[in-house]
Structures are given as structure tokens and as C-alpha cells.
From Swiss-Prot:
The keyword DNA-binding applies. It comes from Saccharolobus solfataricus (strain ATCC 35092 / DSM 1617 / JCM 11322 / P2). PANTHER family: PROGRAMMED CELL DEATH PROTEIN 5 (PTHR10840:SF0). This is DNA-binding protein SSO0352. It holds the Pfam family dsDNA_bind. NCBIfam families: PRK04239.1. The keyword Metal-binding does not apply. InterPro entries: DNA_bind_arc, PDCD5-like, PDCD5-like_sf. Keywords: DNA-binding. GO terms for cellular component: cytosol. Coiled coil: none annotated. Gene3D superfamilies: PDCD5-like (1.10.8.140).
Length: 118
């Protein structure tokens, strides 16, 4: 005897199938949205970077993907706000990378104290 609040196996399986289908659809929509955003970003980068600078950025992306993502976003923001000359050449990109490198550089001081072992 089933109670009004309980589900039988078929209803439960149908609920699970619907939930799984909804989740799959959500994941697919998220993937499409990310692909569209990436396509838009690549399109903007093609406009604001020379081919040589784009190649350098691609090489950076292979080695440091998170850094490259951050750099792409910064370059797009600078270009859209008009704070940088377009197109950005490879030399200008090198200068930007050098500035970022100097900002992130940390000086470490290592002190070695001698201990008398007895």
C-alpha cells in the first residue's frame, strides 16, 4: 500500500530522468555561452593585436593559461577604454609583459644564521 506522499519506482525514475535531462541542458547551454564569449574575445583580440602579438599571446596561453586569460581581459579593457593605441604590436606587448613582470616581482631576503652544534 503506498501513501499519497510516496513515489513508486516508475515515478521516481521519471523524475530522475527529467532532472538529468535538465542538468544536461543547463551544462550544454553553459558550454555554448562560454564558447560564444571566447569567440567574441578572439574576434576583439584579432582587431587590437598585430599577428605577431597574437602569436606571442598564444604561446603564453600554452604555458600559463590563467595568466594569458587575465592578460587578454586587461588588453581588451585597455583597448575599449581608449587607454592604449590599437593595434598593439609585439614590441608593445613585450613592454606590457615587462611592466607586469616588474609589478609582480618580489624581493626575497634569505638570512642564514650559524648555529653552534654541540
Amino acid at each position: 500500500m503506498s501513501t499519497p506522499n510516496s513515489y513508486d519506482d516508475e515515478e521516481l525514475e521519471e523524475l530522475l530522468r527529467r532532472k538529468a535531462a535538465q542538468e544536461q541542458k543547463r551544462i550544454e547551454e553553459e558550454r555554448k555561452r562560454k564558447a560564444e564569449l571566447e569567440s567574441q574575445k578572439e574576434s576583439i583580440l584579432r582587431v587590437i593585436l598585430t599577428p605577431e602579438a597574437r602569436q606571442r599571446l598564444t604561446n603564453i596561453k600554452l604555458v600559463k593559461p590563467e595568466f594569458a586569460e587575465s592578460l587578454e581581459n586587461q588588453l581588451i579593457a585597455l583597448a575599449q577604454s581608449g587607454r592604449i593605441k590599437i593595434p598593439i604590436t609585439d614590441e608593445e606587448l613585450k613592454q606590457i609583459l615587462e611592466q607586469i613582470s616588474q609589478q609582480n616581482r618580489r624581493d626575497f631576503k634569505i638570512q642564514i644564521r650559524e648555529r653552534g652544534w654541540k
